[in-house]
């Protein structure tokens, strides 16, 4: 990857707010009654239109995200049909799926339908995971990441800072991510919501910048993507993340929160002298 290239990725929340897990950081859990938009299936035509818009906004990747524990037969079929439609309409965008815990066989099926990359975040350290989720295990998540690689998919796995974890937890998570040798690593910062058990993100802006730098030290060759919580965490200094080692951004809206206008990101990145990457594998 070129030192001067910045990679942009967009996400589509194709099934929202229907998850029965108890992840304390996530408004998509039905357990917390957060005031978000909830729906079972987004129309595939709408997903295709979002993909077209994402590519027009210079995104090289487009992620199909479903709320829920993992893939069942109906959800797998839906994601595959969506992938087929997007691939046909926007063949030059790299397709990513983020559908929770998945088996090797399910991931092979996604690959058959044009999915190139599977996103499944470790979220935090193994030893801290029970503090933020009790309905599935960290080991379940790690195994899914291994399954994705075994199925021949590129792996995208990262985590969230600001959940109350210790510095030792952060280092442990980064070491675990590095052990998986992913292609890309999304770094999220907890976005508080009054409905969630986690009350606030204790990180300062400087601590967050230092964590980006720390992540890069453990992941020297990966696409390091700043994702959820970027605007809230960094404000007007958000593009300084590149000085600390990041080389990718999620553009547009996030799963349940609004993002910055994509053109504003493009203008800011190019004004700093960076080049927007045209493909994931440059």
From Swiss-Prot:
The note on cofactor binding and number reads: Binds 1 [4Fe-4S] cluster. The cluster is coordinated with 3 cysteines and an exchangeable S-adenosyl-L-methionine.
Instruction: Identify the pathway.
Output: Cofactor biosynthesis; biotin biosynthesis; biotin from 7,8-diaminononanoate: step 2/2
Q: Which residues bind [2Fe-2S] cluster?
A: 63, 98, 156
Under Pfam families, the record lists: BATS, Radical_SAM
Give the residue spans that cross the bilayer.
none
- Give a yes or no for keyword Iron in this entry: yes
- Cite the EC number: 2.8.1.6
Class of this enzyme: transferase
Q: Does the keyword RNA-binding apply?
A: no
From the UniProt record, which GO molecular function terms apply? 2 iron, 2 sulfur cluster binding; 4 iron, 4 sulfur cluster binding; biotin synthase activity; iron ion binding
Name the catalysed reactions: (4R,5S)-dethiobiotin + (sulfur carrier)-SH + 2 reduced [2Fe-2S]-[ferredoxin] + 2 S-adenosyl-L-methionine = (sulfur carrier)-H + biotin + 2 5'-deoxyadenosine + 2 L-methionine + 2 oxidized [2Fe-2S]-[ferredoxin]
Q: Which cofactor does it need?
A: [4Fe-4S] cluster; [2Fe-2S] cluster
Relate the protein's function as given in its record: Catalyzes the conversion of dethiobiotin (DTB) to biotin by the insertion of a sulfur atom into dethiobiotin via a radical-based mechanism.
Recorded hits in PANTHER family, A to Z, give: BIOTIN SYNTHASE, BIOTIN SYNTHASE, MITOCHONDRIAL
| Protein's recorded name | Biotin synthase
From which organism does this entry originate?
Aliarcobacter butzleri (strain RM4018) (Arcobacter butzleri)
Which gene specifies this protein's sequence? bioB
